[in-house]
């Protein structure tokens, strides 16, 4: 069974508590449960990883070489700053879809730049947790 890695960056572990007007009341555990259910239906394996530390995210990407089909990533605030994550994604050559719960282009101007987008086959922003589900369906369609 092919595996999809779902990576979440800083503060995503605080969903349900942090800025509910922006991110809603759903928790990371609920997102993972929804993705696990869909993955079972689609007959694909998902692995979840969240870190507040850029280097740990890079390590996880590098450790995934030859172990995964693709990556769904919400790099959170690292979207706008991390050339390191961009380079890690570039180095493993698997399909990547960037996901954001909020519409980063409707927020503060500094959030409008994504260093990750250039390494992704697509970006989903502003569709809440449905963005993760759409990304998983798309990733499976590429298999």
Swiss-Prot record:
The active site is at 23 (proton acceptor), 100 (proton donor). Signal peptide: none annotated. GO terms for biological process: amino acid biosynthetic process; aromatic amino acid family biosynthetic process; chorismate biosynthetic process; quinate catabolic process. Keywords: Amino-acid biosynthesis, Aromatic amino acid biosynthesis, Lyase. Its EC number is 4.2.1.10. It comes from the Bacteria. The keyword Lyase applies. Homododecamer. The record marks 18 as: Transition state stabilizer. This is 3-dehydroquinate dehydratase. Pathway: Metabolic intermediate biosynthesis; chorismate biosynthesis; chorismate from D-erythrose 4-phosphate and phosphoenolpyruvate: step 3/7. Substrate binds at residues 74, 80, 87, 101-102, 111. It holds the Pfam family DHquinase_II. The keyword Amino-acid biosynthesis applies. It is an enzyme of class 4 (lyase). Catalyzes a trans-dehydration via an enolate intermediate. HAMAP family: AroQ. It catalyses: 3-dehydroquinate = 3-dehydroshikimate + H2O. Belongs to the type-II 3-dehydroquinase family. GO terms for molecular function: 3-dehydroquinate dehydratase activity.
């Amino acid at each position: 069974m092919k595996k999809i890695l779902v990576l979440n960056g800083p503060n995503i572990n605080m969903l349900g508590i942090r800025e509910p007007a922006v991110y809603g009341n759903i928790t990371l555990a609920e997102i993972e449960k929804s993705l696990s259910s869909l993955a079972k239906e689609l007959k694909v394996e998902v692995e979840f990883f969240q870190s507040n530390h850029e280097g740990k995210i890079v390590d996880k990407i590098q450790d995934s070489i030859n172990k995964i089909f693709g990556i769904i990533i919400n790099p959170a605030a690292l979207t706008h700053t991390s050339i390191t994550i961009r380079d890690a994604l570039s180095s493993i050559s698997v399909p990547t879809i960037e996901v954001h719960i909020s519409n980063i282009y409707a927020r503060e101007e500094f959030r409008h730049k994504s260093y990750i987008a250039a390494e992704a086959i697509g970006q989903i922003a502003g569709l809440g947790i449905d963005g993760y589900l759409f990304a998983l369906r798309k990733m499976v369609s590429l298999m």
